[in-house]
């Protein structure tokens, strides 16, 4: 009887074992698992920590007994393979419970070791409570630490899948969270402008972000305080640290056995998952695979590909000619109320190739707008020029966002083009979609671009407009235009365009914009047929504003979060002899009021609070707050250089003060400079 040994369970190894038994009843199959669980839902671990998944047993997909009873497969948990003897086809195994070593022979060996969390040798790492998350015991350790130590603040190092899922689930437990990331964005597999929507969602839910600030060390003080020290030197006080920097392939067994290893440490396999030894196969996070589009080697630590690779190995050992054709990297992650999904190549990756490409953005609803609960989806499609072959897609939005990426992924698997997306037929009913689905819409837009019906410009091209003899027109309503636009734009509403053509210069290149791109498209068709050279801003002002925003500006828009307000006040506070000054400029209502309340909590009796705001609703908010709160005096309320400024102090107002009108102060620039007011 031929013997098959599988090292490692979870996704790839367990799938290979079960599939192999279904195909070959005559094999002796043994699974060796170092940990206490052979097949568990490691993707569910953050949700177990967040108590979304309440019972540990729900994470255990299969047990050794069930494997034996159902598949006649011998699963040995708590057994660590210490070495592979390729010549004699045997493995050395340590039984971790009784510390005995045994040797097992094989005819075929399948490696499914997975990947291990990256833990850099940070200075001071042994002085602070640091955790990684790979398995159920790791999760239990984190949960016990939170409960036993009444954790109030956690710092997550890294903003990838695990970092984001941990941030959400720690917030669900009432823990304040800060993500520290060395790059200028979270989710590095996405392009920056799409990641900005994630930044916004994180900030809105009270997760603080510290981007472009790599961690250099940790330390602890003699009072039990723990600190993360990033390159900026701005220490972060915290109660616990989660390392979510990424993973590296666990390859030490393969290396020691002399198997071929790739430049990034992955085990090299062929399209049938064979290693450099024909009797040894490998699957999962530890292997090097081919990118389906570029045919270049890569590593993709995702559960879906690992399961499929396990099936391929089983087929091959069973005598079938199955082949793994490459990976598209389709993925999805939940970030609070946002679904984030992607497939294929990002623009960042494409810039490293010689492929000629174009991109478009759309913002359709996830289902019919007249049906309650419709939510927008921002969808980016990247495609080859001039063929229209789909190269990648990224989307953020409400429910059903991942469905659109799944459809596009399917089209990509069959080398589909943007013209195929125009014609693709999808199910429709008002609760689930639209007659023109988001997938169709992005196909229409991309096809219009390739056919020359809608030349486009991009959010990052704005600085090139002047040099291109450009004339920028915002075709939204005057009200929308006043709220915000791109610098230098003139406002001609699309409904008035036909009557105001004389205002559009024919000797210039016309650049159009609207909120999401549709109205500007309609305007472009009018102008193009009148002989103008026109381009439309794909994705519209909505994308432009989000893509260009700094983290501080995004935080300002999301200023209702208590955690964001605390950090904002800390950074914007200035102490003078008489005042605590806080500049809450840029925070949207109720952000300035929250900043005021937070500042009053720590205001010394000897000082007054002076707070600046730009939100027009602040005046009414601060007046109402002072009127309802007897322990606070509103001393003055006025304007300084276009900003509202309120002065307050703690203490009960006298009847005379209550009856007296609030004094409105107006000051000149000269007076402000003399008094040394904060920079405005």
Task: Please describe what each predicted stretch is.
Residues 419-430, 434-460, 465-471, 478-509, ...:
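Rhodanese-like catalytic fold shared by cysteine-dependent sulfurtransferases
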